[in-house]
Amino acid sequence: MKNINLIETKSWKDLKNHFKEVKNIHLKDLFLSDFNRFKKFSIFFENEILIDFSKNRITEKTLILLLNLAKEMNVKSAIKLMFSGSKINQTENRSVLHIALRNRSNFPILLNNSDIMSEVNDVLKKMKNFSELVIDGTWKGYSGKSISDVVNIGIGGSDLGPYMVTEALRPYKNHLNIHYVSNIDGTHLSEILKKINPETTIFLIASKTFTTDETITNANSAKFWFLKHSKTKETLDKHFFALSANINNAVNFGINIKNIFQFWDWVGGRFSLWSSAGLSIVLSIGFNNFEKFLQGAHVMDNHFYHTEYDKNIPILLALISIWYTNFFNSETEAIFPYDQYMHRFSAYFQQSNMESNGKSIDKNGNKVCYQTGPIIWGEPGTNGQHAFFQLIHQGTKLIPSDFIVPTVSHNNLNDHHLKLISNFLAQTQVLAFGKSKNSFLKESTSFKKEEDEFNRILPFKICEGNKPTNSILLRKITPYTLGMLIALYEHKIFVQGHILNIFSFDQWGVEIGKEVAQSIYKNINEKTKNSKSYDSSTQGLIDFYNFFKNKQNYL
């Protein structure tokens, strides 16, 4: 497929001219001029999710021009290439087929002339059988006791994704306690080990390559701790499991080959929650619920593949994002889930988006001259309202935001959810329309009496509005709807990367830092210490590290 420089397309040039016409139009004027705006700029999907993108600084013409850009960049052809198993991850010469992991229709997906679905289904069956044994208490630890705790050791996609999903689906949780360890800081693992009993705990070592330093370091320490209690290596077979694409490395670590749940090199780490790397999810919510989770994602996959441009939700949201980053010069996008169970959702898509599209070199190897991936951040509502919404409302930054809320809560505590929904609706309304001087004048009952003081304070109270948002309403957070929602965001990221003409499925920037860390480790480790010198800052920090370390007994 030919790589296209988007700034050379006719659509991009048309958008630049159009932006001059609309950049100062206010959202309240767009709504006043079209009482059908909500109907035109919203999609109700599968009777489960409403996507309202009417509070964006776009007109019907804007949308037409953005869709023209998607067509000129051959987005639908790119989608077909991904779904067909073409090696679109060209810098690593790999296919990108996480959609196969949730292919509930079981249609053939060929890779090297072989249907990969039989392998996918075999692993799913193995996950099902094992999870049922653990959940019903049949699987015993080395002392004959049933399992009570599961520790997932991974990092990046092997941690963020499963952790986010198990938290989001906590209402579906069974009796097992699920723990996640990712940070190489020994504190993370140490605090988990204090809470668990080695006799009733299993460890899932989640690493695609089984070489990731943080994961293997934590896994070795967990194994050492476990063997101190169990005394013999034979007991590992009851307690240690690998979720990996590298079977040899897992076996060399000491994992019984029967305890390895495989995934493949065509599964990117940040999409691995759908694979065996999501075994902790299955153990938390049960395989039946995991199947519903996969089904929800599959429904969104079908929508993404088959639906035309103008009704295709991931394409529309991707285009709107590019509109802000490249024409309004917004640098960040926020995700605000108004659901406490979803408290890790923003962090997960921070990684998924920024690791995918945080690139500055295009597919031809040239430096880009436009903006690529935005900074993604967010917190659950209403906590965020009392932390950083002040800046969104009245600051100097334009921060397009996604607001996500379920209409039905899992916890009907008095009128809590009604108040949560009210805050959700209020924030998107005020961000869009603001509050003007005239509004304050109408509300003021003491204006005549305190006119001078009122006028003095008034400028500080005015909110200009015109801050763009998407509102995403789910009927309820369930395995099915969460699967849909995650797949929606995944496909949005894919479309952005394709239009921006960058490779979204590598992460070379992450790899370089890890290599340098290995070099520094050898220098500051007493056993391998060498005389290598670094830049003055790094060397100065090393010297002070050694100073503090040597003085620690006296501090």
Swiss-Prot record:
Provide the reaction this enzyme catalyses: alpha-D-glucose 6-phosphate = beta-D-fructose 6-phosphate
The cross-references to CDD domains, in alphabetical order and at most eight, read: SIS_PGI_1 (cd05015), SIS_PGI_2 (cd05016)
**Gene Ontology MF, one:** monosaccharide binding
Query: Where is this chain's protein located in or outside the cell?
Result: Cytoplasm
Pfam families with a match to the protein in the record: PGI
Q: Which UniProt keywords apply?
A: Cytoplasm, Gluconeogenesis, Glycolysis, Isomerase
- State if Signal is listed as a keyword: no
Quote the pathway field.
Carbohydrate biosynthesis; gluconeogenesis; Carbohydrate degradation; glycolysis; D-glyceraldehyde 3-phosphate and glycerone phosphate from D-glucose: step 2/4
Q: Which GO terms describe its cellular component?
A: cytosol
Its EC number(s): 5.3.1.9
**What does the entry give for GO biological process?**
gluconeogenesis; glucose 6-phosphate metabolic process; glycolytic process
Active-site residues, record numbering mapped to chain: 355 (proton donor), 386, 514
What is the documented function of this protein?
Catalyzes the reversible isomerization of glucose-6-phosphate to fructose-6-phosphate.
What is stated as this protein's family in its record?
A: Belongs to the GPI family.
Protein name listed in UniProt = Glucose-6-phosphate isomerase
Q: What gene name is listed for this protein?
A: pgi
